[in-house]
């Protein structure tokens, strides 16, 4: 049975259920398993497997203490009736993004209830967490999910956990630094167990504060007297990360079925990412046997990952830019820690030292040997705001296909980076429906943008012949239920107050 431990220590190994329930390790590290890759997902027969079967295979390989019937139930509950496309994450073919002629495909990850890729994992995580109850007499313990969001995680987590028994959720978002649609998705969320709060600061401020909340032993002791423990719905929780591995295999299976590739062909994935979780799932897929030639990191103007992969120095001491791709406006990429662990061959002392330097000094520099190993797997590129707008227009002009600003970062990077030799296809992960960012998309197409985002949606619909998802268009008529805004140092009190209302 696979066990999980912190990226910063081999002590106190846990089962996957325990790791999911806790969310983050007591020393601040993230949970990893040294058995990653010991089980391989067979490529033979992959083309015949639908998404639900693939999900059962991948989850069984990574969450080994869940019984097969538990995994089957989680998969059924998460995906059978909650996604608008039968493929769950369908693949669309575009014209080659680069002059090298290698086919380009888009993996649409936004057909879930909140129109963002986070739905794939956050429809699954509550089901996994519901089956982590202990048998040691503490089964009545309640869980308070605490999550910082740069835009999409918040609504997807709220939708997944709303009214879940024995669970509450507190979501923090940076006030004024998410799109109007994203903010309304959160502030109109219904549910007796949900709490939403804006924070005065950026996402990194909020995410750092959440980690400090998890490390606050006095707070944990006070909550324990109420029968409450804290956990996370961010991708720092391994139960959030693992479900994302599935759609890499699903994309490959669809290309096999369409005849675009043959079994064993290598493919590239380009991933718009800020917190490194989505692309880390691709690395997990590679370790599980998927023929991944290269994983390409696409960043926006907050290009800390580009600089890191280019120079080997991670430096968060830099200007923060508010862009049209708010879910990538991040300067501290939490999931990078897991990648460092695996590519340093499990060197917990090195990882602990680097993370300490990042916290205390704001930067760290990798050993040359480790940087070389990382570059064998990961490439990188980035797009500024003008390049993002041009990419949205180019994709529409060349393909009649709308993309959001996050996806546009990846489209730009692919168009300026030839495929690695031997790669038979390039797959761009599309992380959000373009109607979540109607103003940016309409502006990029040169359309008139009314002051109201919902009027922008209508302009976009008329000009392109596409339709806004119903769940987004209806937001303008929903009452705002959450109006709290706090300073960063008020977040812990907000969580404690929300936990006091759990039933």
Feature locations, PLM:
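PLP-dependent amino-acid enzyme catalytic core
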Residues: 1-503
């Amino acid at each position: 049975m696979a066990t999980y431990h912190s990226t910063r220590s081999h002590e106190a190994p846990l089962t996957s259920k325990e790791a999911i329930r806790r969310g983050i390790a007591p020393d601040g590290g993230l949970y990893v398993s040294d058995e990653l890759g010991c089980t391989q997902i067979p490529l033979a027969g992959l083309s015949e497997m639908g998404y639900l079967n693939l999900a059962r295979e991948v989850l069984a390989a990574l969450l080994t203490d869940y019984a097969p019937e538990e995994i089957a139930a989680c998969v059924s509950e998460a995906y059978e009736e909650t996604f608008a496309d039968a493929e769950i994450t369908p693949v669309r073919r575009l014209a080659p993004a680069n002059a090298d002629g290698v086919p380009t495909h888009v993996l649409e990850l936004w057909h879930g209830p909140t129109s963002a890729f986070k739905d794939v994992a956050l429809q699954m995580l509550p089901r996994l967490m519901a089956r982590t109850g202990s048998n040691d007499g503490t089964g009545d313990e309640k869980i308070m999910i605490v999550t910082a969001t740069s835009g999409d995680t918040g609504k997807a987590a709220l939708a997944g956990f709303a009214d879940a028994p024995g669970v509450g959720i507190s979501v923090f978002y940076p006030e004024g630094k998410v799109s109007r649609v994203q903010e309304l998705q959160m502030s109109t969320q219904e549910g007796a167990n949900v709490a939403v709060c804006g924070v005065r600061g950026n996402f990194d401020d909020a995410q750092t504060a959440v980690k400090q909340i998890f490390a606050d032993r006095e707070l944990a002791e006070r909550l324990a007297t109420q029968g409450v423990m804290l956990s996370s719905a961010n991708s720092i929780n391994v139960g959030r990360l693992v479900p994302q591995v599935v759609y890499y295999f699903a994309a490959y299976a669809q290309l096999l079925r369409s005849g675009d590739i043959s079994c064993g062909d290598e493919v590239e994935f380009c991933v718009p990412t800020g917190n490194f979780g989505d692309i880390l799932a691709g690395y997990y897929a590679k370790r599980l046997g998927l023929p991944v030639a290269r994983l390409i990191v696409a960043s926006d103007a907050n290009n800390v990952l580009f600089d890191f992969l280019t120079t080997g120095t991670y430096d968060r001491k830099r200007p923060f830019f508010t862009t049209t791709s708010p879910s990538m406006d991040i300067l501290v990429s939490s999931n990078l820690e897991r990648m460092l662990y695996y590519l340093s061959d499990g060197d917990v002392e090195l990882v602990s030292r680097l993370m300490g330097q990042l916290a205390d000094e704001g930067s760290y520099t990798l050993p040359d040997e480790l940087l070389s190993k990382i570059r064998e797997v990961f490439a990188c590129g980035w797009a500024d705001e003008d390049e993002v707008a041009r990419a949205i227009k180019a994709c529409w002009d060349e393909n009649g296909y709308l993309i959001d600003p996050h996806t546009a970062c990846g489209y730009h990077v692919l168009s300026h980076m030839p495929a690695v030799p031997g790669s038979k296809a390039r797959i761009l992960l599309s992380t959000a429906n373009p109607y979540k960012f109607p103003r940016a998309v309409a502006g990029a197409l040169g359309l008139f943008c009314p002051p109201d985002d919902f009027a922008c949606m209508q302009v976009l619909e008329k000009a392109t012949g596409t339709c806004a998802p119903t769940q987004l268009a209806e937001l303008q008529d929903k009452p705002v239920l959450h109006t709290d805004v706090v300073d960063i140092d008020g977040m812990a009190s907000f969580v404690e107050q929300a936990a006091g209302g759990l039933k």
